């Protein structure tokens, strides 16, 4: 039987391949036929007009025989091509394909007969012509207003032990579209010895049964579908077989929801009835026992120990800059927007460009010279040598010039760029590296963020003759320990990192030092105060660069002040 099916399938495939070849050949032979007819017509025109012999003044009869031979040859070729074309057209294999099959095998619609899509559900229950009281109702629903003579006879088979009291419960019981009560088998897969009383709740519908979902409503078909003439083999003729099929599908679905332990008979849906106690289901209910969640080991920006700094102290520092008290209430929103700006404007594009440069280096035959693997010195040399081929490498190297451990820096930048708002940020440490915890030989996340922020503004500020290395912003507005800013100079406006581990940042402006509380927000609040002063007291200008909408576009985080 299997060999015969394979031969049938191979024959079908061979036929479709042949049809595709003939479809392509039809176009070719038709083109050649038209070309041969055209050439034969041109030669015949020359034979009657004698243009070549007259123009070149040569003997006419030898040329006439040559032209006659060519005209005959082209005419025969044209006849042969047209005969092949009509052969492919009239004698094509007779095969019936659905539109999806025609698209799959690539057979033109004109060469195959179209057939409608087969119905996905072919097993249906034959039902005789329904009586007027059955019109518009589900065959698995129960209507209390229906008389016993009009009730379907298989209801007692589908729901064993179900004996409803047939009573006239509604005044419009004679209407063809009566209100019905539909008992869903999804909630009660098997109901035994159940007899509803007239006082039972009724779920009414004006146009048919209530759709409660489940497999029975999924496999049901409307009564109008049963009257359509189809093959007898497409029906389930045994009502018990239908009931068994529905129950088995419900049992499979229930076991799939409970998991592999539901294979025992105690968890079978046929055992869920009113005669069993709760203790019988202890094994199943144990799967859904309430348990406390385990504490996540992932780093979180909300669990730092140093985040217990006094909010009141921060408000006192901000009060020296912001005179309007309600603005201080927006500090959390400003911090979130600023973190998101760093991620979307610097981190994500930086990681993308690093991966792009790594791909370009491999294409140039330098697989050993990669970002995250080679030293910063090698990358700087490559940026000079490969500048015409990879112009962005020189820019990326500036962001990576913070630690000798390039592998850790590359992986940490990728981790920080995930999540949209630097969710893995750790202000006084960093991430794990090769299975070991972060140590002081690696830069903190605060140092990394501060470095890339300064490098980004270095690239936006115009070059300055005092700073040939291009670090204009870093040289003017960032001082790192052990160096100290000149507080006596009124023009000094910078961010001072007074401590490396743990990192601590202060703002120096007009001979004043603004020391915000330590913790995970110290870096962001210091930078926010730096930007806020630029917006409110420097007209949004950092030197000759506008940090507003027409420039760097970072001051939008404060909104309209």
Swiss-Prot record:
The chain crosses the membrane at residues 28-48, 60-80. One of its GO terms (cellular component) is Golgi apparatus. Residues 120-149, 191-233 are annotated as: Disordered. Coiled coil: none annotated. Glycans are attached at residues 94, 273, 343. Keywords: Cytoplasm, Glycoprotein, Golgi apparatus, Membrane, Nucleus, Transmembrane, Transmembrane helix. Residues 220-229 have a biased composition (Low complexity). It is a multi-pass membrane protein. Its main location: membrane. Residues 125-140 have a biased composition (Polar residues). InterPro entries: Cytochrome_B561-rel (IPR019176). It comes from the Eukaryota. It is found in: Membrane; Nucleus envelope; Golgi apparatus; Cytoplasm. PANTHER family: TRANSMEMBRANE PROTEIN 209. This is Transmembrane protein 209. It comes from Xenopus laevis. The gene is tmem209.
């Amino acid at each position: 039987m299997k060999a015969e099916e394979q031969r049938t399938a191979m024959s079908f495939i061979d036929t479709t391949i042949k049809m595709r070849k003939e479809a392509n050949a039809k176009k070719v032979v038709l083109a050649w036929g038209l070309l041969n007819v055209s050439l034969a017509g041109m030669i015949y025109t020359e034979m009657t007009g004698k243009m070549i012999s007259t123009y070149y003044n040569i003997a006419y009869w030898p040329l006439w025989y040559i032209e006659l031979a060519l005209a005959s040859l082209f005419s025969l070729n044209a006849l042969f091509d047209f005969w092949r074309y009509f052969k492919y057209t009239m004698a094509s294999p007779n095969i019936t394909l659905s539109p999806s099959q025609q698209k799959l095998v690539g057979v033109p619609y004109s060469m195959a007969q179209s057939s409608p899509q087969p119905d996905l559900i072919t097993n249906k229950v034959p039902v005789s012509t329904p009586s007027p009281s059955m019109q518009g109702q589900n065959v698995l629903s129960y209507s209390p207003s229906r008389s016993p003579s009009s009730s379907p006879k298989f209801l007692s088979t589908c729901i064993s032990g179900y004996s409803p009291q047939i009573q006239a419960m509604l005044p419009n019981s004679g209407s063809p579209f009566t209100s019905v009560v539909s008992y869903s088998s999804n909630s009660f897969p098997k109901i035994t010895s159940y007899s509803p009383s007239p006082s039972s709740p009724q779920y009414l519908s004006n146009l048919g049964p209530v759709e409660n979902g489940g497999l029975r409503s999924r496999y049901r078909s409307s009564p109008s579908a049963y009257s359509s003439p189809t093959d007898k083999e497409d029906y389930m003729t045994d009502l018990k077989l239908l009931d068994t099929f529905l129950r088995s599908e419900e049992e499979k679905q229930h076991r799939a929801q409970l998991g592999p332990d539901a294979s025992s008979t105690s968890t079978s849906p046929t055992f869920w009835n009113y005669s069993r106690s709760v203790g019988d289901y202890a094994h199943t209910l144990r799967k859904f026992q309430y348990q406390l969640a385990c504490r996540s080991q992932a780093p979180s920006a909300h669990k730092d120990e140093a985040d217990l700094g006094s909010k009141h102290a921060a408000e006192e520092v901000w009060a020296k800059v912001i005179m309007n008290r309600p603005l201080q209430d927006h500090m959390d929103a400003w911090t979130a927007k600023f973190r998101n700006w760093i991620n979307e404007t610097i981190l994500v594009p930086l990681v993308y460009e690093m991966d792009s440069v790594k791909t370009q280096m491999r294409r140039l035959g330098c697989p050993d010279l990669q970002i995250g693997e080679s030293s910063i010195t090698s990358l700087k040399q490559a940026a000079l040598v490969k500048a015409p081929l990879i112009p962005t490498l020189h820019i990326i190297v500036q962001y990576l010039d913070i630690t000798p451990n390039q592998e850790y820096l590359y992986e940490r930048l990728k981790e920080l760029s995930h999540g949209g708002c630097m969710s893995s940020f750790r202000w006084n440490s960093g991430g794990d590296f090769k299975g070991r915890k972060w140590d002081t030989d690696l830069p903190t996340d605060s140092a990394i963020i501060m470095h890339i922020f300064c490098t980004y503004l270095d690239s936006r500020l115009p070059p300055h003759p005092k700073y040939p290395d291009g670090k204009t912003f870093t040289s003017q507005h960032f001082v790192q320990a052990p160096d100290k800013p000149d507080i006596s100079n009124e023009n000094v406006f910078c961010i001072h990192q007074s401590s490396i581990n743990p990192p601590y940042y202060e703002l120096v402006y007009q001979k004043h030092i603004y020391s915000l509380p330590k913790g995970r927000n110290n870096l962001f609040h210091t930078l926010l105060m730096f930007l806020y002063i630029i917006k409110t007291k420097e007209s949004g200008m950092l030197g000759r660069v506008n940090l507003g909408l027409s420039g760097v576009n970072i001051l939008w985080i404060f909104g309209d002040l």
